[in-house]
Amino acid sequence: VDQETLFNRHVRFVGDRVAAVLADTPEIAAAAAEKIKLEIEELPAVFTVEDAMKEGAPQLHEDGNTVTLPECGFGGRYADVQGEEFIHRSQTQRVSHIAMETHCAVADYNPGTDRMTVWSPTQSTFGVRSCVAALLGMPMSHVRAIKTPMGGSFGCKQEMILEPLAAVGAKMTCRPVKLQLDRRETILCTVLRHPIKSEIRANSTKAYSQSARPDR
């Protein structure tokens, strides 16, 4: 299935999802997953922001490596820059949210009524509903998303990660499907807080009035 919501033929990182196994027990599914064989062509990699922005850099996505180029600030090109310049650079690492509860989703499809029900500890109940409906080509009125009690999130459960795959599996098999990640899988295969490199330039006069502050 060449559908990036589920899988993608262009693997970009360790933890990228390439296949799924549905079985009667977690043990059978794990054993079957070990037997999957992949043929992967190694592509040029990019590991830093600076390398990704270089001319001729390997393109991780078809539409380029840059997500957006927002512009904001005051002073600088909008006013006369005066006084001493102060430059502050900072860097943060990639951070996992480490919610007490790992990611989990359950889906059940009723072929008689063409109704899908998805249970998950999500922060985006209506996002799950619209995503599953669009993916399966079902009316939104036929999809019900139920938010279960959440064992922590801190933002990591805003995205639809397991819910679409569980729903597809349930519709394919007409049986309930449960997907649950352990701690290692949650760190490798779900969303993390992005590492950030920032630079702030400020110009101040002797009277400590700030005249320019372009950020990036």
Named regions from a protein language model:
Residues D114-M116, G151-K157:
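Helix-loop-helix module between adjacent transmembrane segments
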Residues A105-P111, S130-H142, L165-Q180, A202:
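Proline/glycine-anchored alpha-helix kink/cap motifs
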Residues S141-T148, R175-R184, S211-D215:
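Beta-strand segments within the central parallel beta-sheet cores of soluble alpha/beta enzyme folds
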Residues V1-C131:
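Extended, polar/acidic
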